[in-house]
Amino acid sequence: MKTPRLPIAIQQAVMRRLRENLAQANLKLDRHYPEPKLVYTQRGTSAGTAWLESYEIRLNPVLLLENIDTFIAEVVPHELAHLLVWKHFGRKAPHGKEWKWMMESVLGVPARRTHQFALQSVRRNTFPYHCQCQQHQLTVRRHNRVVRGEAVYRCVRCGKPLVAG
């Protein structure tokens, strides 16, 4: 799927939110953390990722276009919080107490680990598998590993191997 073109107004709204959150954090933490690089190259079902070493936030343009307001209000500060935790505390658990504190006390945003966006437009084909207790959907990559005999996946609930079909 080709990456959609983001209107400049949306990019500006994202940057505005990022700068507001960063200014707020710098003020509350009495620091001068730099502005991270923002790129719109995230793919798949992830709304965004924070890359610590390159100090970069990657955002999913498809999910952004489909959920503009919620995406800007939640995903941008979520990813910024990861970078700020890394700068302020060093390497910590991705959604640990430091991240939660950064989200809620510093940025004033509810600390949610995952988004609730509809994923139909970004979800790849999946393959049905089952165990004794439920149905599962495996990605193409996992399905191919099963077919080649490279992997056996088990249900986290019952522990039984997953079977195609």
UniProtKB/Swiss-Prot annotation:
PROSITE patterns the record matches: ZINC_PROTEASE
Active site: 79
GO MF term set: zinc ion binding
Cellular localisation: Cytoplasm
Cofactor(s) recorded in Swiss-Prot or TrEMBL: Zn(2+)
GO biological process, one term: response to stress
Keywords recorded for this protein, A-Z: Cytoplasm, Metal-binding, Zinc
Binding-site positions, Zn(2+): 78, 82
Coiled-coil ranges (or none): none
InterPro entries named among the record's database cross-references: SprT-like_domain (IPR006640), Uncharacterised_SprT (IPR023483)
Pfam families: SprT-like
Residue ranges of every copy of the SprT-like domain listed in the record: 22-163
Domain of life where this protein originates: Bacteria
Xref: PANTHER family: PROTEIN SPRT
Stated family: Belongs to the SprT family.
Annotated protein name in UniProt: Protein SprT
Species in which this protein is naturally found: Salmonella choleraesuis (strain SC-B67)
Gene it is expressed from: sprT
